[in-house]
């Protein structure tokens, strides 16, 4: 098992897996000063009170929690958010409310999940052309919508 060093502010919650098979560890809101209200179509940057030291070659992806999306229309706006191995600041989660009613985020609420992933770096090489494929330049919807 890979160990990731974490600094957790007093009163904040350590990232935690809910089940043995969970791929994402829940991140909780760190709001000791009181709750935040997210209006419909509004967005808010929610602190977690957690800083991590990821080994080079790993990243942390900040992903939505399915229950928040289903029940309230609340999701992570820049999903997945990326925490790079050289970032040492507090993890903050950009939530957006796509629902019809205001949503309140309170201290300790589970707001996102953190998934650790390997990073493969490549060298981009300038070229005058790239190989042709059957798909070609077909983009959004080119292979069918449903």
Curated annotation (Swiss-Prot):
It comes from Treponema pallidum (strain Nichols). HAMAP family: dUTPase_bact. Pathway: Pyrimidine metabolism; dUMP biosynthesis; dUMP from dCTP (dUTP route): step 2/2. Keywords: Hydrolase, Magnesium, Metal-binding, Nucleotide metabolism. This is Deoxyuridine 5'-triphosphate nucleotidohydrolase. Its cofactor is Mg(2+). This enzyme is involved in nucleotide metabolism: it produces dUMP, the immediate precursor of thymidine nucleotides and it decreases the intracellular concentration of dUTP so that uracil cannot be incorporated into DNA. It catalyses: dUTP + H2O = dUMP + diphosphate + H(+). The gene is dut.
């Amino acid at each position: 098992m890979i160990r990731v060093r974490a600094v957790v502010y007093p009163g904040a919650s350590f990232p935690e897996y809910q089940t043995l098979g969970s791929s994402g560890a829940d991140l909780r809101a760190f709001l000791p000063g009181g709750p935040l209200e997210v209006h419909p179509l509004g967005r808010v940057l929610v602190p977690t009170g957690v800083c991590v030291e990821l080994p080079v070659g790993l990243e942390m992806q900040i992903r939505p929690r399915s229950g928040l999306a289903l029940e309230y229309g609340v999701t992570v706006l820049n999903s997945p958010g990326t925490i790079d191995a050289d970032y040492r600041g507090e993890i903050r989660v950009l939530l957006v409310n796509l629902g019809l009613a205001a949503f309140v985020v309170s201290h300790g609420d589970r707001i996102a999940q953190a998934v650790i992933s390997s990073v493969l770096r490549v060298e981009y090489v300038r070229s005058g052309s790239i190989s042709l494929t059957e798909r070609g330049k077909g983009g959004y919807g080119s292979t069918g919508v449903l």
